[in-house]
Each structure stands twice: as structure tokens, then as C-alpha cells.
Amino acid sequence: MTAIAIHPESLRDVVASALGDRVRQISVALDEVTVVVSAARYLEAMQILRDAPDCKFEQLIDLCGVDYSAYGATGSEGPRYAVVSHLLSVSLNQRLRVKVFCSDDDFPIVASVTDIWNSANWFEREAFDLFGIVFDGHNDLRRILTDYGFIGHPFRKDFPLSGHVEMRYDADQRRVIYEPVTIEPREVTPRVIREDKYGGLH
């Protein structure tokens, strides 16, 4: 693995200085820097991260949605949806994770970064398809993985594991048809391991 060109704590300070009051939180964990910015200033922050001389994050290498509604033991009490981006500076050999929370849980929306990095195009479509996060300014925001007639967003924590409908080919109609799911819900009993005499040990 190639050594990083800048120490994570130094990168944290560089990013904090470049973004100024656009930073809501910045941290280092496992030698990775994560910065949280507000949805209102997300686009502005991303432009700076690409163009600032000490940052030069020329590449967006990943972008995904996250549903925090079941995060942790009791679930998250903050905003439900976030968009997480991973940026790479090829010229400075450094990486950064950027997180932005959607301000409205009922209609999650953030600005599109496709005008800054065109690689965001399909990533944003995927986050829209699977989580229902709308990217304002995206010029072709439509589903990319699920079927055109699909209802709902399957990576949301409240989406049923079995889904709502199943599809099959109907030979009489000579087409694919949708039907309600026929899988019956069942109780799953958690496995209990008793410490006494576990595995035949005495």
C-alpha cells in the first residue's frame, strides 16, 4: 500500500482551514479524515475541496446514501439520511470522506456534484434509486438498478426484506407481470447460547 503523503491530523487541519465555517464536524479515525458539512453549503464546500491548492481532490471515487434510522443500539436521533462521498487527490496522494445530512427526512434532498465531478452521475442515481435521496441539479435523475415500475427504495431500513411485489413471466399474456409477494412472514427466534456445558465442555 502506498504511504499517504500527508499525516491524517495535518490533512484534518488543512481541510478545516480551507473550508472554514462550512465545517460542522471534522474527525480522524483509523487514519481517515471525515468532514461533515451542512446541506446548505455542501456544493460550495465540495468546489473548494476540488480547487483549493492544499486539497486538490480531483477525483470523486465513491458516493453513497446512508439511512441512519436504525443506527446504533437505539437508532439515531438526528437526521435520517446522509450522503457520503470519498475524494482522492492524485497529485497530493491524499483521501477524504465528506458527509452531508439531508435536512428533511420526509423529502431528502442535497445538491448534485455532477458539475464538479462527472463521475458522480451514476453514484447519485444509485443513491436516489436505493434510498430515495434527490440530487438537486442532476440532469438525469432516474432509477439505475431497480425496474422502472419499482415502488419504494429498497435500501431504506423500513423497506420490507421480502419487498412488496414479485414478478414472473405469464405465458398466457406473453409478458412479465407483477403480483403481491406470496412469502408469508415468519417469526425468527434468536439463537440462545447457554454458557454452562457449551459445546460439551464441563
From Swiss-Prot:
GO cellular component terms listed in the entry, alphabetical order: plasma membrane
Cellular localization per UniProt: Cell inner membrane
Keyword check for Cell membrane: yes
Bilayer topology term: Peripheral membrane protein
Main location: membrane
Reaction catalysed by this enzyme: a quinone + NADH + 5 H(+)(in) = a quinol + NAD(+) + 4 H(+)(out)
Single GO term (MF): NADH dehydrogenase (ubiquinone) activity
Keyword check for Cell membrane: yes
EC category name: translocase
PROSITE patterns (UniProt xref): COMPLEX1_30K
Top-level taxon of origin: Bacteria
Keywords: Cell inner membrane, Cell membrane, Membrane, NAD, Quinone, Translocase, Transport, Ubiquinone
Entry EC no(s): 7.1.1.-
InterPro entries assigned: NADH_DH_suC (IPR010218), NADH_quin_OxRdtase_su_C/D-like (IPR037232), NADH_UbQ_OxRdtase_30kDa_su (IPR001268), NADH_UbQ_OxRdtase_CS (IPR020396)
Transmembrane segments: none
Quaternary structure annotation from Swiss-Prot or TrEMBL: NDH-1 is composed of 14 different subunits. Subunits NuoB, C, D, E, F, and G constitute the peripheral sector of the complex.
Function: NDH-1 shuttles electrons from NADH, via FMN and iron-sulfur (Fe-S) centers, to quinones in the respiratory chain. The immediate electron acceptor for the enzyme in this species is believed to be ubiquinone. Couples the redox reaction to proton translocation (for every two electrons transferred, four hydrogen ions are translocated across the cytoplasmic membrane), and thus conserves the redox energy in a proton gradient.
The family this protein is said to belong to: Belongs to the complex I 30 kDa subunit family.
Name listed for the protein in its UniProt record: NADH-quinone oxidoreductase subunit C
Gene behind the chain: nuoC
